[in-house]
Amino acid sequence: MSPNSTADSDEKKYVLAIDQGTTSSRAILFNHDGGIVAVDQKEHEQIFPRAGWVEHNANEIWDNVRSVVGGVLAKAQINRHEIASVGITNQRESAVVWDKNTGEPVYNVIVWQDTRTQKICDRLAGDDGPNKYKDRVGLGLATYFAGPKVTWILENVEGARERAEAGDLLMGTMDTWTLWNLTGGVNGGVHATDVTNASRTMLMNIDTLDWNPEICADMGIPVSMLPEIRPSSGVFGYGRKNGLLVDTPISGILGDQQAASFGQACFEKGQAKNTYGTGCFMLMNTGTTPVRSENGLLTTVCYQIGDEPAVYALEGSIAVAGSLVQWLRDNLGIIADSKDIEALAASVEDNGGAYFVPAFSGLFAPHWRPDARGALVGLTRYVNKAHIARAVEESTAYQTREVLEAMNRDAAASGSTGAALTELKVDGGMTRDELLMQFQADQVGVPVVRPKVAETTALGAAYAAGIAVGFWSGTQDVIDNWAEDKRWEPAMDEAERERLFRNWNKAVQRTLDWVDEDVVE
């Protein structure tokens, strides 16, 4: 069969998802039922040039993407003719700038965790404060977002500003870099992004889904550098002629947390998912109108399918969840293995009065208090290591409840009736912890539901790509494929639930105002 022949539709059995993450790049092959056929994965180097700086090598990442695509095809023993389409999901906010004529990055990827842009953010905020652009872009000024990272590169890499103004440089988040290279690079590569990734740059109008030239000018970013913004599900381009995926449509792009929401079939207003990893990321679907948060949450795009209206979400991020369990293991030695925490915590009936607020680098949503630091409170001689383990488990559930209550308040204030939570879909490594999941249901007061396919992020990108080419007919197929693995119903007495949460809130208050601005940590 020649490379340009059209294969019969029944020959197209799979969709390929490329998951370009913070620590590794993965390729996952899915079948029509949403089941995993094969996976390949390759880690990349974490580069720390200075305290607070985190970088990746963009060329290394592209090499790894090519490697895992080849690896997954070999493992599944298939060729590109059996692949209907390709979806991309990615670590959000990480930014790269490259020369469109040579394909070479002018600097390393500046990763979402990197904090070097704080002075740029302070300068942009001026007297208006960190919410200067929030009405327009849905985000407060913060070092997470991609726009100021590009500003830093243009201001600090020799010759970059001049090359950008001459029209020689392009910028993008990691979806854009991957897409541009997959579709040909310097030989006609497609320079585009989707609405979810664009919504994390601080450069996109959240209402109109286009670039804001005033904010670009404030940040000193020529509009010529920016990718075209497109729907999440739609054909972006086709695999390059000299690659493994020649002529295969690349037809879905979603930022990682939005992809997880899509993979969890959160298509109705008021549906929410929480991903339990190093931290927690919760997204609640708020429908086709953006809801502005008055309660410390971000307004973001959830997804857009073709010409349909974009669907929005409120997002709350929790800095420390699974990493607290690692800290208990590595720093205190209370457990030997992360999975041991559940049995230790279950060996006592309650927390013994102990509460652990893991504000190791401040508190994220909904508090946004960088001055907070971690605290273990309520200690008596009665408390033992099992009570501390239980307090660690419970802290993730309390923090999740704080974010959910903020979401419900925002939804109610916006008049967005029907957007109050009815069940919480969960994914990520910590969802294997039965004690935590039951306590989570007890605290949020609604059922907590775990799906059978744990790889919800890659699955979401695959669905977006497959829908665009008719491999799946639409979101109803995603809903039909989604299968429940386990459900935890709230079982705690209301008075006890509220007593515990009241004490948690008291514990949070004890962590605030800890860092003085004039004290160097």
Give the ranges of each region predicted by the language model.
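N-terminal glycine/serine-rich phosphate-binding loop of ATP-dependent small-molecule kinases
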Residues: 1-107, 135, 228, 233, ...
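Active-site core segments that coordinate phosphate-bearing ligands/cofactors
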Residues: 2-10, 16-18, 118, 125-140, ...
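Short secondary-structure junction motifs
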Residues: 24, 80-83, 224, 351, ...
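Carbohydrate-associated surface elements
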Residues: 114
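A structural motif corresponding to the C-terminal end of an alpha-helix
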Residues: 218-225
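Short linear loop/turn motifs
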Residues: 226-235, 342-346
